[in-house]
Amino acid sequence: MYFTGFADEAGKEIDTQIRATKELGWRFIEARQVGDRNIHDLDDAAFDAVCEKLSQAGISVNCFGSTIANWGKAITDPFDSSLAEARRAIPRMKRLGTRLIRIMSFAVLKDRPPDDQMEEERFRRVGLLTRMFLDEGLQPVHENCMNYGGMGWTYTLRLLERCPGLKLVFDTGNPVFSDDRTKPPPYPKQSSWEFYQHVRDHVVYVHIKDGTWDPATGRIRYTFAGEGDGDVRRIVTDLLRRGYDGGFSIEPHLGAVFHDPTVETEAETRFRTYVEYGRRFARLVEECQKSLQQ
């Protein structure tokens, strides 16, 4: 078991991301944004510079937090851009010695019901992307987010059935604000524990996020791990009980909300919040481990 995180929430530049990781005493980063671009979209010179700085610092990238087929990509859009992102990511993952890459299953078509989401085209595209990575010895992991698989655990299982070799990264916080489309409308929010229970046999990686849903504002209020409704402590304990030895990747959303560029804090506050989040979560894991020894 190891700790990692979306260090771009500590700071945009790779130097800051490395500094936060080293302050936590960790050896890994889940690489997403460097500057204003995803790691698979950096120009060659910028990527070379990132590789050199990581190497000098002794920090490794355990996963590419790619934008491939994510919530910003429509299934009705041409597939070419997703294929191009995958082709750019593969050689960069190999250079960094990174085996995991986070992908999704395209945005939910909000004007259509759950049973009319162009499933077959989604399965075709995600299946092709999965094979592209597997053929190169790399492992794609699907995140339950604002995408087809994130509509509920039944949709995730259907996706896995139709895309052989695809595995899961389970995000503890996303169900808190996601409609549960396995149930009839008006859709309630999902239960992280319920979702996790149904898909845990396929989980090889975990994103740690937490929060509470505010019906009055229609927004999620992000919290430190274990302080919200994401069932973080319960899920972590169950994973450890089952012998989980993969990564826990923190995605605080407290000092920087990646999906909303209007939410900003001062640079040092972002940095300190990320480090504090990591320290608190490490203590939570230690407490979960001790509870299993009692």
Task: Label each region the model flagged.
Residues E30-S55, F106-D111:
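Glycine-rich, proline-tolerant flexible connector loops at the mouths of alpha/beta enzymes
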Residues M1-A7, I29-A31, V61-S66, I101-I103, ...:
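Hydrophobic faces of well-ordered beta-strands that scaffold small-molecule active sites
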Residues G255-Q294:
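Aromatic-rich peripheral "rim/lid" segments of glycoside hydrolase catalytic domains that contact
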Residues F64, L128-D229, E286, L292:
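Acidic/histidine-rich catalytic cores of soluble enzymes
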Residues I18-L24, D41-C63, R87-G97, G127-D135, ...:
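Acidic (Asp/Glu)-rich catalytic clusters
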Residues E13-R19, S55-Q56, G72-F170, F177, ...:
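Active-site acidic/histidine proton-transfer and metal-coordination neighborhood
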Residues L42-A49, F79-R87, D115-G127, W153-T154, ...:
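Charged helix-capping and loop-helix junction motifs
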Residues E9-G11, Q33-G35, T67-N70, S105-K110, ...:
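Active-site-proximal loop/turn and secondary-structure-junction residues that shape catalytic pockets
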